[in-house]
Amino acid sequence: AKLHAEGRFHEIEKLLLIAAAAEYGAHISGGIPMSQVEIIRPEAMGVSKSDIRRYEDAVADVVAAGSTDAVKARLAELIKDMQGATTFGDSGLDETHAEIHEQMRKFSEAEVVPHAHEWHLKNEYIPMEIVQKVAELGVFGLTLPEEYGGMALGKESMCIVSEELSRGYIGVGSLGTRSEIAGELILNHGTEEQKAKYLPKTATGEILPTAVFTEPNTGSDLASLRTRAVKEGDTYRVTGQKTWITHPVRADVMTLLVRTNPKEKGYKGLSMLLAEKPRGDDANPFPAEGMTGGEIHVLGYRGMKEYDISFDGFTVPAENLLGGEE
């Protein structure tokens, strides 16, 4: 509606809209494929059969209109004519977001694209010089409040930044998400002391966080995780296994999800620790006592590296319990 009102809704925007609507409509009505063996049907999301019947003809019309060979052929022709563009059609971004997009596009073209293929082939870390430049662009504090050194921009800005940096190399595009996860957790649930300690340094990139959630045999079912943290005086002692942890070697702080109350099943027994650790390298990935791990070699998504991690008596100060309460 905005693009139409401003006279910016042309043929390519219309075709992109109806093609996308057809794709989404087909998935929502027929089932959203979560994996090769799992499909979420509308009924599973609480949609009644009467509501499904009420809208199924309209959805079928949308799917049919956007799935024709003519639509696909014309859209392909228009995209071909725009070869070299980073986006197709008018994105509808306002002036601020358009400036962010252009800034990230230029950085990606100049600093990332020329080197990305070599980083991938050699399975190398993204150089710290690039990480520092990403920090200087404000990426790590993009959505944090100004009082903590952030830029106080919205989630849409983070989407734009992640998308444009990922166009150069997916690992660079994901750098900011580690800080985004930690920043969101600490900002919304941390004590005032934890916010003051971690958020400003996260915003500048002085602290690189990593999310340590998933475990073998549980995957994204975080309510079933088993890694234990037992409080002994003013310290938590952590024991357990984690897997598919992104960029843990060079991280300074782990947002470490653990079970502090084994009597409570599911989410109620879980707590989050802000677990500090020294940075490692390929020769000595985890110098911290009570922490070991091995790299998970992957075909793609390189640059930060994935790891299995084992904790055996790894200690975290009790004051680093997120929010101060289990």
Segments (PLM) and residue ranges:
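Flexible, small-/acidic-enriched active-site or ligand-binding loops
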Residues: 281-313
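N-terminal glycine-rich flavin-associated loop
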Residues: 174-193, 219-222, 235
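A short, Trp-centered hydrophobic/proline-enriched beta-strand micro-motif
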Residues: 205-213
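Buried hydrophobic positions in well-ordered alpha/beta secondary-structure cores of metabolic enzymes
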Residues: 108, 138, 145, 161, ...
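Cytochrome P450 C-terminal beta-domain/meander region
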Residues: 133, 221-239
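Flavin-dependent oxidoreductase catalytic core characteristic
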Residues: 1-122, 127-148, 152-155, 159, ...
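A short core secondary-structure module
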Residues: 235, 239-289
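Short Gly/Pro-enriched turn/cap motifs at secondary-structure boundaries
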Residues: 217-220, 244-247, 262-264, 298-305, ...
